[in-house]
Curated annotation (Swiss-Prot):
Its EC number is 2.1.1.-. Belongs to the class I-like SAM-binding methyltransferase superfamily. RNA M5U methyltransferase family. It is an enzyme of class 2 (transferase). PROSITE patterns: SAM_MT_RNA_M5U, TRAM, TRMA_1, TRMA_2. This is Uncharacterized RNA methyltransferase lmo1703. InterPro entries: MeTrfase_TrmA_AS (IPR030390), MeTrfase_TrmA_CS (IPR030391), NA-bd_OB-fold (IPR012340), SAM-dependent_MTases_sf (IPR029063), TRAM_dom (IPR002792), U5_MeTrfase_fam (IPR010280). SUPFAM superfamilies: Nucleic acid-binding proteins, S-adenosyl-L-methionine-dependent methyltransferases. Residues 5-63 form the TRAM domain. One of its GO terms (biological process) is rRNA base methylation.
């Protein structure tokens, strides 16, 4: 029996009590929870129910009767359609407060820990919260008689929203994407059709090194064949000297994953170089690197503040990517060991260590939950561990290993408060949370990064 008093299509007034983990407004109508994208805490609004479930209603914003002082006009022309950003309509200072609250909500929802007893610090923001993303991944589609469009899929859909400019992207990523889009149209290169499974070019990926100016272009294709390749490469080389690496990645899977397993060089170098905390890093096409290089240094500074190091410690950098975090700490510890499931990332990490003259690091391809127990069996026990997992959080096998290993210091760098809270509830068996530091890596979105210092409990 449906306990929800709301019917689909119904319009009703609502007061927004708080904002949710996806940046939506939350209110209550006859005690039933209502989620309203685009609404802000404290606003009095009129909404229309678009999806009704037993326990909640999703509604669209029809009218604002009382506007929040934190409401601003979103500067992006496709903001509401695109879905890439969720908070452009919220003043930046209020975005930072919301992100701290999102961390609190996650603790409340996924653990039995009382967040009022935790030290959750104010969110560290950016001075200029725009044009920060160093990487773009724009989908392609063919419209009309041969016109090529590039953009992002709308929120919860596979409807492409054409994007001419994106104001959270580094300008060069947009410049390169638009140039390549026009080349694809000029030469009539077949564009991938998701429904039919036909066509060739699926996605245009561009990544830039903000400190070096080096830029990499990757054609994601449905086959090894890339028509008019020679002509396009010649035009790119002539018009875009900043593009120092051009790669092709083949992805024939019918999935939402951008990259396939096979990547090869078309022109220039295999990787681009970026600098971070006075270190140099080579980035290959599939390797993970933080998307906001400006805030990454702030993030790593917070990790550095969290750890107490004397120089005699052994440190594990789990989910190490190209080795950025571990190599930033290599000069402060006896040994760093890192692992990652992407072979190219480990190759990059080894090359980066050599480039930076760092000799006390060891890297291995594999899952953290498999590699760490293997190292322990071989006699290696870390004094400190840094985990920086993907949005899915730490594998449960790794959590078990961490509890078995009992490193005195554990720093968890999270990009998803929900999975962070889930993992903290498990780690609480042996660790206590010293503090949580939210960092805004993705202004204008509901995403929040959190640095958590955990300390082994006394036995």
């Amino acid at each position: 029996m449906n306990q929800n008093p709301v019917e689909e299509g119904q319009k009703f007034p609502l007061t927004i009590r708080r904002m949710g983990i996806n940046g939506e407004g939350i209110g209550y109508f006859k005690k039933a929870v209502v989620f309203v994208p685009g609404a802000i805490t404290g606003e009095e609004v009129v909404v229309e129910a678009v999806k009704v479930r037993d326990r909640f209603t999703e509604a669209k914003l029809n009218k604002i009767r009382k506007k929040s002082p934190n409401r601003v006009t979103a500067p992006c022309p496709v903001y509401e359609a695109c879905g890439g950003c969720q908070l452009q309509h919220v003043a930046y200072s209020a975005q930072l407060e919301l992100k701290r609250d999102i961390v609190i909500q996650s603790i409340e929802k996924h653990t039995k820990i009382d967040p009022t007893k935790l030290k959750i610090r104010p969110t560290i923001g950016m001075e200029d919260p725009w044009r920060y993303r160093n990487k773009s991944q724009f989908q392609t589609r063919m419209v009309g008689s041969g016109q090529v469009e590039t953009g992002l899929f709308g929120a919860n859909s596979h409807q492409l929203v054409p994007i001419e400019d994106c104001i959270v992207q580094q300008p060069v990523t947009i410049k390169v994407t638009n140039f390549v889009r026009d080349l694809l149209e000029k030469y009539g290169v077949p564009i991938y059709d998701e429904k039919a499974g036909s066509g060739i070019v699926r996605t245009i990926v561009v990544r830039t090194g903000v400190k070096t100016g080096e830029t990499q272009l990757v054609f994601i294709t449905n086959s090894k064949k890339l028509p008019k390749k020679r002509e396009m490469l010649a035009e790119i080389e002539a018009a875009l000297p900043e593009v120092t690496s051009i790669m092709q990645n083949v992805n024939q899977a019918k999935s939402s994953l951008i990259f396939g397993d096979e990547t090869f060089l078309l022109a220039g170098k295999e990787s681009i170089e970026e600098k971070l905390m006075e270190l140099e890093f080579d980035l290959s096409a599939r390797a993970f690197f933080q998307l906001n290089p400006f805030q990454t240094e702030r993030l790593y500074q917070e990790v550095e503040k969290a750890l107490v190091l004397t120089g005699s410690e052994t440190l594990v950098d789990a989910y190490c990517g190209v080795g950025t975090i571990g190599q930033a700490f290599a000069g402060k510890v006896k040994e760093v060991r890192g692992m990652d499931i992407i072979p190219e990332s480990i190759e990059d990490a080894k090359r980066n260590a050599e480039k930076n003259g760092i000799e006390n690091v060891y890297y291995e391809v594999g899952k953290a939950e498999d590699v760490l127990p293997k190292w322990v069996k071989e006699g290696f026990r870390p004094d400190a561990v840094i985990v920086d997992p993907p949005r899915s959080g730490c594998d449960q096998g790794l959590i078990k290993s961490l509890l078995d290993v009992e490193a005195k210091q554990l720093v968890y760098v999270s990009c998803n408060p929900s999975t962070l809270a889930r993992d903290l509830a498990l780690l609480a068996k042996k660790y206590r949370i010293r503090y949580m530091q939210p960092v805004d890596m993705f202004p204008q979105t509901a995403h929040v990064e959190t640095v958590v210092l955990l300390q082994l409990k006394d036995k």
